[in-house]
Amino acid sequence: MLPEAREYLTRAGACFGTPIERLAQMNQPAIGIDCWWQTNVKGLFAVSEAAASHGVYRPGGTALNAGQVGSTRAAQYIAARCRGDASAGFDAAASAALAEMAALADVCRADTGNVRALWQHAAEEMSRCGAAIRDPAQIRAYGKQVEAQLADFAQTVKAGSRTELAMLYHLRDMLLSQRAYLTAMTDYTAHGGKSRGSALHTDLTGGVKPFGQLPDTFTFALDETENPLVQELWYEDGVCRTAWRARAPSPG
């Protein structure tokens, strides 16, 4: 083992026992969940951060399992085991949504589709500006692109097959999600948010570069305060809105 690797494991307290015993200490959930991410309260599912199984400092595989796999398995269980009477107004809301998506399919049908290229572009752009390295200027610029693409979605996105039509719906969901995340990131830095364990936010005015040869994007300042407020975001009338509120006290 390389000395650097041994030093890292030693400082992390990972040089003991068997691999299973060591892994059992990583990201232990604060809430008991089963293999379907259901808590000991029947019908209540806690996934990812809600179960404290997806923290700021985490290995990538754990994050994937906690977030994407956990939510998928919870949805599968709910669809198969938690059937019941629909709440009041569900049929009307579902009918309206189905009609909207059927109309979208009619408008976006074409002999040759472009949804794959648009999907690739959206994925690459989000990875470029909204992953671990976040430049506020790039986030704002791509956020405007996302807004424009959603506004002109029916006119600009085309599907040439059933497979591409499925991708078209996923692309729409992807862009809506990107709009929410980009709005939250922009609002975070606008309220003085700095770099933390999960992301480096470019700060060209009050930040420093750890190494001079790095691009200016790596200029940052650490968030050394504990913000008592929680950022909230919701979708209303086609717009992502944000607000900050005090944290709710812990029960008990």
Regions found by a protein language model. Name each.
Residues 1-59, 132-252:
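Mobile, glycine/GP-rich and aromatic-enriched active-site lid/loop segments adjacent to catalytic centers
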Residues 43, 48, 55-56, 70, ...:
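Aromatic-residue detector
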Residues 53-78:
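A conserved FAD-binding loop/helix module that cradles the flavin
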Residues 65-68, 85, 92, 192:
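Short, surface-exposed, charged/polar-biased interaction segments
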Residues 82-162:
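Long, amphipathic alpha-helical stalk/connector segments used for oligomerization, subunit docking
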